[in-house]
Amino acid sequence: MIFGFMLLGIWLVASLRGGITSLDNSENMANFFQNLWITINPFERLTRGFEYFYFGFAALVVIVFGILFGYKKSRTGFVTGFIILLMTTKSAYAVLKHLPGSQYLWMLRFISIALCMILMSFLMWDRLKKPLVLMLCVLLAVDTIPSLSLIVGEHNDISVQERMAARQDSTLISNAQTVTKQRLALMDESILGATGSWLVSDYGNPVDATFGAGREAANTSTNIVNLNKAFAQGGFLYVFDRCLELGDDSVLIKKTFLKQYNNSLEDLEAAANVLGYKRVEQNSDYILYHIETPDSWGVVSSYRAVAIGSGAAAISMQFPAVETVDSANLNDYTYEELAGYKEVFLNGFTYDDKETAEDLVLRLSRAGVKVIIYADGIPQDKRTHSQNFLGVTCSSITFHNGYPDMDTRIGTIYPDMFPQGHTTWNTVYLDGLDTVWGTFYDNGLNLDFYGTVKNDNIIMTGLNLTYFYSLTDDVSVGQLLSNMSGISSEELPDRKIVPLKVEYGNNEITITSNNDNVNTTLAYHDIFSSSSDITHRNNLMYVNKGTTVVKMSYPYLWRGALVSTAGVVLMVVWLIVKRRNNN
């Protein structure tokens, strides 16, 4: 079996190094698990439609029969199918997301494999009595009824063209296609499924889109997830600003979700206007915004602050003026790269060399750059297995239902209770701060959670306040977080829309720009190469002034070919040895 995998090396190496398996995004992964009752209940299929995966009640019956009454040869497939079914549940997600390689385990995508294993074992079950075979076959056939309309249609005497045109008009997609010059963001939480993506990009007057069917596999999937999350939290300034970063001159929003998330249309409208988007059209369900741009354009941006680490996106959503970067490793950045920012946030960062990382933070702080460190995300020391950085040690603590009152330099804070599902809160407080700006009492002890170390430009905070704020939008905690950095949640990065000329050729993209450091709004991929200087930030490709020719080639070709060649050689050797042993 190992040799078989090696034979696939030319494909496998590229797949494991890039693409969907390189993504580390729990929000994307969570979309591929669901309630077991939905998975096996045919009535849920009839009432909810086709937005959920359906395993089949009949398939479950076949599994039970096979496990209980099948013999060894056929039972294996039934057991395998049952295990895969259990692994698709929300409960399994809570475990699988913590495992190494969890980015491979989007379990609902394995349902088809499970069904094939079950059917194969059913066919191999040659000892099963014919009446039972007939009964199970009839049950399997009947179980297709909830999904029958996918094959035969609705039988409502309306042609596909009429139905699609009506759907385009009712959702304002046709209006959006008319005004869109470069790209459209359809923000409806994919309620239309793949149909919505098809109506935008392949029907009528098709235009490019930011969202799409199978967007989980996109290189910009984290950007898309953050847009949806910010919209749910009411962070409309972030939404429109990042739509601009992604090259969306049109944004089409389903208004139902404003009410669902207790957000207001007035706040949405105000944020759109701040970024230059104007309302073009609206109906009872959708509202369309558009900003005037050249036909093909990019963005030159300037951020006052940068966030590094797995928690960078949460900071950026609270403070849109904060840039997120691709690597969480602090050792990947130089002093010169970070010294141009006023603030550097570290949240869930890593390092290869602790001493070098600490030295970088100290140099930045002495140069006047404020470094805000969220202590919950400080890496564990490899020798002591403790969370320690710059002489400050993180000590674990658990709260239940809510934080205690917090005494801070902006006054006493009385935070909201923990939200449902997070009533047990594991976090850290701090030992070793030079100046203490925040304390709380627990079990009669006065404990520190907020202050400075080494100098006033290095600020540390514990208690996982950023994550708490992302869940609750607690006003007092938001004020404290803003006070730490001096950045307002209303502040935006400086952006300038600039014209670009983009031409697509045979396995190449030619980009002509009149400016340096231009975000092309095109997703960056590891198949890109160029003799010119191209870079990538926040999953997007940047070019400089002049003409840049980007070549597209098969990634990791030689490494993959080497693995495949080794697989062929080892397979031949194994076959020769096996043949000699048989003789």
Where are these regions (language model features)?
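Extracytoplasmic/lumenal acceptor-recognition loop(s) of multi-pass membrane glycoenzymes
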Residues: 142-145, 150-154, 176-249, 257, ...
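Membrane-embedded transmembrane-helix bundle of lipid-linked glycan/lipid transferases
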Residues: 1-159, 171, 250, 279-282, ...
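Catalytic cores of secreted or luminal carbohydrate-active enzymes
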Residues: 244, 259-260, 268-271, 285-288, ...
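Extracytoplasmic/secreted cell-surface and envelope-processing proteins
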Residues: 193-196, 259-267, 352-358, 373-374, ...
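A glycine-rich, often tryptophan-bearing local segment used as a flexible ligand/cofactor-contacting loop or short
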Residues: 355-414
